[in-house]
Amino acid sequence: MSDIIQLLPDHVANQIAAGEVVQRPASVIKELLENSIDAKASRIQVVIKDAGKTLIQIVDDGIGMSLTDARMSFERHATSKIKLADDLFSLKTKGFRGEALASIAAIAHVELRTKTENDEVGTCLKVEGSEVVSQDAFVTPKGTSISVKNLFYNIPARRNFLKSDNVETRHIIDEFQRVALAHPNISFSLLHNGNELFQLPITNFRQRITNILGGKTNEKLVPVEEDTEIAKISGFVGKPEFAKKSRGEQFFFVNDRFIKSPYLNHAVTASFEGLLKDKSYPSYFLYLEVDPKSIDINIHPTKTEIKFDDEHALYAILKSSIKHSLGQFNVAPILDFERDSELDTPYDYKNKEADAPQVEVDRNFNPFQNEGSSKTQFSGGTNFRKDKPAEWESIYSGMQSETDTDIDIRHIEFESEEVTGNLFGAREEQTEKSTFQVQKKYIVSTLKSGILVIDQHRAHTRVLYEELLKNITVSSAVSQQLLFPLLLQFNSHEVEMLKEIKDSLEQTGFVFSSIKKEEVEISGIPTLISESEVEILLEQLIADFEKDVPDNGFSQTDLLAKSLANSMAVRSGTLLNSAEQQHIVNRLFACKEPALSPFNKTVFTTLSVDELDKKFA
């Protein structure tokens, strides 16, 4: 038998390696930015075209490279960062494997211009598909400029897997922000298709966070400081009242390197226990300095996962330091002596004029409406007519008729709490209760064959989901125009997300006047929601669209309807009167799929008389 094992050619091996290192344009940005930082650059400019698919250019004022080093930098495993295996445990640089440039050059057209301070002229090197096309002397300033064009030009399948420009731009912004936050001592700029997205001067940590996420971020931050033998912790956490629906503003940096750590994230979340609203996530920007010998970063191609020698101790220190900072903030205001006076002007309550009282008008009030109207009103402002009795009512006639069991529902003691607001705007009917609530979570009704138990939140979600989906698919969504446009503040990441789903949002009734860098202007909203709910709903939408669920086959329209319905539905823990309970039950069984919520969760269950008899046997 002849030999069949062969050594792969370098260009094939480089293409295979590129699959690990370069997954999308954002991966190229990350690798090249880290190279510039290792080159001791104080100013770095990033230029991209068509979300990096056509051009990615990084220009820095670092130390540059000699003629020989420029050529060697494109060889596999050629690096200036380490020489021995032991050097891996004392790393202070971003790169060390010598794979990035070789991998990038294998799948793109690369042009490198570089010059050291001592050289009179620089070097211009062109590489295409791992092959050096030319190497010439070139007049260029000190530093390095590297251009990556036509990414994945020789791997069409990989290029076809790239997402839309909006999605790829969002990933680029994410990587750019992570690097920029870790290095406030370096000036960064980002241009996309000639438009400036970021211009970040050299500053301190707090100012850099504010410059990236917006001017109002500064007032939301609580400083965290702790210095121990295991680690030095510094940075900021967001105040609990400013917690968000998404995890977009959560950053860990270890020795100036962005990392992802579910374990340390749990420590932060645990320190906010009892302070956050349901399904809200705190913002944090935490910098950890540890001995390089106590960590291992060589466990993942992206270097975002790190192993710590004493992870449990670090968990305890982190949790304790954040709790201390939050406690200090709650007891008395924190005096920040490093605060930059140019960030913002604090409120001066002594000299501030009182705001004019706001008059709230009920747009749905109709003095001529018959009190016995069959319409039922949701909090969002839309009226839903009570349908004629559906077929299910004849099947489950026990819901509206007197129960045939020995227990008289009229003599059950209901909760004596008053309903603070009538969810549907109709008077509670002074009739016999055919439904009642359990723990303000479940709606219980009697059947001829037993008992029906309904999850009120899931049921209402199903009702709203089908209503929204119908409006969107038949293009019948109605928009209510606002007298004064809403101006909402979002960070760059969230703005890019809104741009991505803007068309689908407009199908639900939203009207966007403009979407700028950190501000969104809305002149119209769906009739199902009120102005006060818009910002919360959009935050939840962004959070839902950020979740990358592999087996999620729903379209943007379905996901929008699901997210809006889930946000608008009545929550568990809400006290409902009989009319409200009955309305949800009636509308639920008029749905196409009443048994399951839009998230495939059980909406109701039944308990037969036979099952009850067995319980008392």
Swiss-Prot record:
One of its GO terms (biological process) is mismatch repair. SMART domains: DNA_mis_repair, MutL_C. InterPro entries: DNA_mismatch_repair_CS (IPR014762), DNA_mismatch_repair_MutL (IPR020667), DNA_mismatch_S5_2-like (IPR013507), HATPase_C_sf (IPR036890), MutL/Mlh/PMS (IPR002099), MutL/Mlh/Pms-like (IPR038973), MutL_C (IPR014790), MutL_C_dimsub (IPR042120). GO terms for molecular function: ATP binding; ATP hydrolysis activity; ATP-dependent DNA damage sensor activity; mismatched DNA binding. Keywords: DNA damage, DNA repair. Coiled coil: none annotated. GO terms for cellular component: mismatch repair complex. The keyword Transmembrane does not apply. This protein is involved in the repair of mismatches in DNA. It is required for dam-dependent methyl-directed DNA mismatch repair. May act as a 'molecular matchmaker', a protein that promotes the formation of a stable complex between two or more DNA-binding proteins in an ATP-dependent manner without itself being part of a final effector complex. This is DNA mismatch repair protein MutL.
